[in-house]
């Protein structure tokens, strides 16, 4: 099935606003690309991972009307400030090729690279996670995923069991296994996410250490680490479940939280967990703590 693709070029400070607008308008995928051929490495904590000029690609179903979409997007912009744009009809195979051309390796910490599965890793001796997320799932460029990967690279995961709740592409579960964990359970309500996770685990040689599950079918095991990169609302609902899924002394890593939601999350989880100082990237927060 063909798609309608919008391409808009904005500054780094405008990316979040535009991405949110595109998602609200019905985009099935929003991808951030380098607009000026500027190299991107995973930055230190607190620094933006975006290029100074960023091209935002948004994919809409073919049934969408481009003129209506543009009118909707322009409503919240002054006429002279709306970004330059173009749109085109994109066949499935062309979208996949374009996406593959722009997915570049990213480094997290001193030892982990997230690399496209079709390119050789920049540092073959490093810990290399080969990722092929497809249209629907992320690659590590979003601040919440970057925060989680950075935290995992600094943790002692040897012989650990980890639960990745809301796994998407499986990037966090697979990273944990590549960094020394011996078992991982990847949980997601979307069957396509579970399929993508299994395929990515196979590409990385860790499928024998990984189980996938929907939330409704999850067996309540105990984990040494539980990471949940979702959103504040489901995190608030899941606090008691996460307490049941973790050993005393186990680590809990929560992301997908904005700065103004920290206190509500801490109050909800305070019955079971003690948290360290938040890690913040842009306005996104990672809360890491341990089970009492």
Swiss-Prot record:
It comes from the Bacteria. GO terms for biological process: methylation. It is found in: Cytoplasm. The keyword Transferase applies. It is an enzyme of class 2 (transferase). Gene3D superfamilies: Vaccinia Virus protein VP39 (3.40.50.150). GO terms for molecular function: protein-lysine N-methyltransferase activity. One of its GO terms (cellular component) is cytosol. Keywords: Cytoplasm, Methyltransferase, S-adenosyl-L-methionine, Transferase. The keyword Transferase applies. Methylates ribosomal protein L11. Belongs to the methyltransferase superfamily. PrmA family. This is Ribosomal protein L11 methyltransferase. It comes from Nitrosococcus oceani (strain ATCC 19707 / BCRC 17464 / JCM 30415 / NCIMB 11848 / C-107). The lineage of its organism: Bacteria, Pseudomonadati, Pseudomonadota, Gammaproteobacteria, Chromatiales. The gene is prmA.
């Amino acid at each position: 099935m063909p798609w309608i693709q919008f391409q808009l070029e904005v500054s780094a400070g405008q990316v979040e606003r535009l991405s949110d607008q595109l998602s609200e308008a019905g985009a099935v995928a929003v991808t951030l690309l380098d607009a000026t051929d500027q190299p991107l490495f995973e930055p230190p904590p607190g620094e933006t991972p975006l290029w100074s000029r960023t091209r935002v690609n948004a994919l809409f179903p073919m049934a969408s009307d481009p003129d209506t979409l543009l009118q909707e997007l322009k409503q919240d912009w002054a006429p002279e400030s709306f970004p330059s744009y173009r749109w085109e009809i994109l066949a499935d195979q062309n979208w996949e090729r374009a996406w593959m051309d722009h997915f570049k390796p990213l480094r997290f910490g001193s030892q982990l690279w997230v690399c496209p599965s079709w390119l050789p890793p920049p540092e073959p001796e490093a810990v290399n996670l080969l990722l092929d997320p497809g249209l629907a799932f992320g690659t590590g460029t979003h601040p919440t995923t970057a925060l989680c990967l950075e935290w995992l690279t600094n943790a002692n995961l040897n012989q650990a069991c980890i639960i990745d709740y809301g796994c998407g592409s499986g990037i966090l579960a697979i990273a944990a296994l590549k960094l020394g964990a011996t078992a991982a359970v990847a949980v997601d309500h979307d069957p396509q996410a579970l399929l993508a996770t299994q395929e990515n685990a196979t590409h990385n040689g860790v499928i024998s250490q990984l189980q996938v599950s929907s939330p409704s079918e999850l067996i309540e095991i105990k984990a040494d680490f539980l990471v949940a990169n979702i959103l504040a609302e489901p995190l608030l609902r899941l606090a008691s479940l996460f307490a049941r899924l973790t050993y005393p002394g186990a680590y809990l890593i929560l992301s997908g939280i904005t700065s103004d939601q920290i206190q509500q999350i801490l109050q909800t989880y305070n019955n079971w967990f003690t948290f360290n100082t938040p890690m913040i990237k842009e306005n996104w927060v990672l809360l890491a703590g341990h089970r009492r």
